[in-house]
Each structure stands twice: as C-alpha cells, then as structure tokens.
C-alpha cells in the first residue's frame, strides 16, 4: 500500500491527488481489475500477445517517423 507524508499545511485535495498518483504508479487498480474475475489461461495469453503486438507496432511507427525526419532534414 503506497504511503504519503502529509504536512500540516497541505490541503486535503493535494494529499488525495498525491495518494492517487502513488496508487497508479504501484499498479494497484490495474491489479484489482485483473483479479476481479477469473480469466482463462488462453485468454490471458491472447491478451498479453495482443499487447505485445501493439507495443511492437508502436515502436516500429516511432522508428519510421524518426527515419522520415532524418530524410527530410537533409
């Protein structure tokens, strides 16, 4: 569980925002959503593979854009 230090002069909304950010970084909500329902192992593999393909496509697109920028620069 993420913990934050709240000085006396800080407002509640600032502390809440910092706590939410800490929870997001720790991955608590995503983990909760994953274990909320049982997911079959085949579905889990399929989801992870789709995420990997998406990451790879995004990486390729960034590389292509960088190449295009290099070509147009000269």
Curated annotation (Swiss-Prot):
UniProt cross-references to Pfam families, sorted A to Z: Ribosomal_S21
GO cellular component, one term: ribonucleoprotein complex
Superkingdom assignment: Bacteria
GO terms for biological process, alphabetical: translation
Molecular function (Gene Ontology), one example: structural constituent of ribosome
Keywords, sorted A to Z: Ribonucleoprotein, Ribosomal protein
UniProt family annotation: Belongs to the bacterial ribosomal protein bS21 family.
UniProt-listed PANTHER family: MITOCHONDRIAL 28S RIBOSOMAL PROTEIN S21, SMALL RIBOSOMAL SUBUNIT PROTEIN BS21
Protein's name according to its UniProt entry: Small ribosomal subunit protein bS21
Organism: Coxiella burnetii (strain RSA 493 / Nine Mile phase I)
Name of the gene: rpsU
């Amino acid at each position: 569980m993420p913990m934050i230090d709240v000085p006396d002069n800080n407002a509640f909304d600032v502390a809440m925002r910092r706590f939410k950010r800490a929870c997001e970084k720790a991955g608590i909500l995503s983990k909760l959503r994953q274990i909320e329902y049982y997911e079959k192992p085949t579905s889990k593999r399929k989801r992870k593979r789709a995420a990997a393909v998406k990451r790879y496509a995004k990486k390729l697109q960034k590389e292509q854009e960088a190449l295009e920028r290099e070509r147009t620069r000269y």
